[in-house]
Amino acid sequence: MTKGILGKKVGMTQIFTESGEFIPVTVIEATPNVVLQVKTVETDGYEAVQVGFDDKREVLSNKPAKGHVAKANTAPKRFIREFKNIEGLEVGAELSVEQFEAGDVVDVTGTSKGKGFQGVIKRHGQSRGPMAHGSRYHRRPGSMGPVAPNRVFKNKRLAGRMGGNRVTVQNLEIVQVIPEKNVVLIKGNVPGAKKSLITIKSAVKAAK
């Protein structure tokens, strides 16, 4: 069965194992998520569990949103997402970090940091041209394509806005779970800025 939870990225730190091994970890705070709706094939066409995370003031919610969360007897939520392949939950139930344990392999999804308008070298990793005085080609994108089409093809790698994309990093290991603080420590780095929304769920391609 799939495990999943929504949380916020706190930042990075480091821990040491009993043998003295140094491990860089990302700290993710995941307060209990509330199940707002259980979707079924009969009513919705597919099976999923809708969860809410991070309370917000009622004045910021409209009537439909208030009525939706009232069924779960909880406050309006800032973030609402769905998880599939999670069974045995009812509306109003809570998902906490206690469902995970050290050694679990998970996929982590977040929104990458925005870098603004960037050139092809930083955005796509292209090589630069010669930097000597005789060269007229330094950091430009280069050839736009052959003469025959008389146009630039779609998806040509050019300069543009970089970052701000949905990114999933697969097969990360949970190093430690601290239930009393609603904190999960994940080995390595995860996408997103501090305080950004992070989705943690069981790895799809984990080795069995």
From Swiss-Prot:
Signal peptide: none annotated. Disulfide bonds: none annotated. The keyword Ribonucleoprotein applies. Keywords: Ribonucleoprotein, Ribosomal protein, RNA-binding, rRNA-binding. GO terms for cellular component: cytosolic large ribosomal subunit. Transmembrane segments: none annotated. GO terms for biological process: translation. PROSITE patterns: RIBOSOMAL_L3. GO terms for molecular function: rRNA binding; structural constituent of ribosome. Coiled coil: none annotated. The keyword Transit peptide does not apply. Residues 116-148 are annotated as: Disordered. Part of the 50S ribosomal subunit. Forms a cluster with proteins L14 and L19. HAMAP family: Ribosomal_uL3_B. One of the primary rRNA binding proteins, it binds directly near the 3'-end of the 23S rRNA, where it nucleates assembly of the 50S subunit. NCBIfam families: L3_bact. Belongs to the universal ribosomal protein uL3 family. PANTHER family: 50S RIBOSOMAL PROTEIN L3, LARGE RIBOSOMAL SUBUNIT PROTEIN UL3C. This is Large ribosomal subunit protein uL3. It comes from Streptococcus agalactiae serotype V (strain ATCC BAA-611 / 2603 V/R).
